[in-house]
């Protein structure tokens, strides 16, 4: 079977589908991955066929987009900003994916792009989505995030309450996306988004561990939990020697914010330098935010990109942004994290 994988975003959006692609290859399927050229090298190093998809951005543009996302006050505003960021290339992206779909037997796509299902239906190609966040999976015995829980109320009342909020959130999300991308969808004969939350596809893969969450008795059968899909970049041998020399057989704290970026970095790092105890070793991964310090402190080790598995074996604990990929790696390593 020929499978097309589609995703966009930061490394946390890209790497899980590389892991999925390798699993599909192991099961003797042919796999191609359509995403931005920024990730072409990593995809091809994994032995997966790369397919071009816009945007053809350099890394600094992606960093600016991540910084804009960090400014959003709530999940709905964040989702709207994601679609707003993609307006300049959304039409080209739809056209590109439309051309690739007909060459494949199955499409597995990031949950951000459920509108590609319309294209798959036109070509009679099965379509599935993949999501990295369990908090957007609706069930009447699970209260949506940020909504008060009715603990202590009869189960029937709780179910009505939760179902109401899931339906409302579903409509708000649909309207929010359509308000941004509706004209582009219309120009490609794609109807407005409907049921982004409740019915994104006939199959929605949730790559989160079931053991970490409440087990819903009313989960729609379209949502299937696979556990985390982890992919690690190659080991950096030169950095390995530096880490061994720096740590001297001791585990040390590690700070990493991955591909998240944010405002006022210089002020934040100045406070960090002022308050971090002298002589206490720590590893600081610069990440997409470009974290750094302004003075020479030999007890603070600044490093660039490296795989979680290589880095976290030196960790006493990890302070991180809570991204799905980083959280999965910390849990895999079995170390404390904040």
Where are these regions (language model features)?
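Phosphate/nucleotide-donor binding subsite
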Residues: 49-104, 155-163, 171
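Donor-nucleotide binding loops and adjacent catalytic segments primarily
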Residues: 207-317
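Conserved nucleotide-sugar donor-interacting segment of glycosyltransferase catalytic cores
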Residues: 88-160, 211-213
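N-terminal subdomain of nucleotide-sugar transferases
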Residues: 1-51
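Alpha-helical membrane-targeting segments
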Residues: 76-83, 140-186
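Long, low-complexity segments enriched in small/aliphatic residues
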Residues: 177-228
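A donor-sugar binding/catalytic signature common to diverse glycosyltransferases
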Residues: 21, 107-109, 303-338
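Generic beta-sheet signal
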Residues: 34, 53, 110, 128-133, ...
């Amino acid at each position: 079977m020929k499978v097309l994988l589609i995703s966009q975003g930061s490394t946390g959006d890209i790497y899980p589908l590389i892991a999925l692609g390798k699993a599909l290859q192991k099961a003797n399927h042919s796999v191609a991955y359509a995403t931005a050229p920024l990730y072409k090298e990593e995809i091809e190093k994994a032995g997966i066929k790369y397919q071009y998809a816009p945007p053809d951005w350099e890394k600094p543009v992606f960093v600016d987009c991540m910084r804009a996302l960090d400014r959003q006050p709530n999940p709905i505003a964040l989702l709207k900003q994601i679609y707003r960021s993609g307006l300049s290339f959304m039409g080209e992206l739809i056209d590109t994916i439309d051309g690739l779909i007909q060459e494949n037997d199955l499409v597995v796509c990031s949950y951000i792009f459920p509108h590609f299902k319309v294209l798959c239906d036109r070509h009679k190609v099965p379509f599935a989505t993949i999501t990295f966040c369990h908090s957007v999976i609706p069930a009447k015995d699970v209260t949506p995030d940020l909504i008060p829980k009715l603990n202590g109320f009869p189960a029937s009342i709780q179910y009505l309450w939760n179902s109401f909020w899931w339906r409302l959130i579903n409509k708000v999300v649909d309207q929010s996306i359509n308000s941004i991308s509706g004209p582009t969808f219309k120009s490609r004969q794609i109807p407005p988004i409907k049921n982004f939350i409740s019915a994104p596809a006939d199959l929605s893969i949730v790559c989160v561990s079931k053991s970490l969450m409440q087990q819903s008795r009313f989960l729609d059968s379209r949502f299937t939990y696979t556990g985390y899909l982890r992919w690690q970049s190659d080991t950096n041998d030169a950095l390995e020697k530096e880490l061994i020399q720096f740590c001297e057989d001791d585990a040390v704290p590690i700070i990493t914010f991955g591909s998240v970026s944010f405002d006022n970095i210089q002020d934040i790092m100045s406070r960090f330098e002022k308050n971090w105890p002298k002589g206490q070793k720590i590893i600081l991964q610069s990440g997409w935010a470009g974290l750094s310090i302004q003075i020479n402190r030999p007890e603070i080790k600044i490093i660039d990109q490296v795989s979680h598995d290589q880095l976290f074996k030196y960790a006493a604990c990890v302070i991180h942004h809570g991204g799905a990929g980083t959280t999965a790696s910390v849990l895999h390593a079995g170390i404390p994290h904040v």
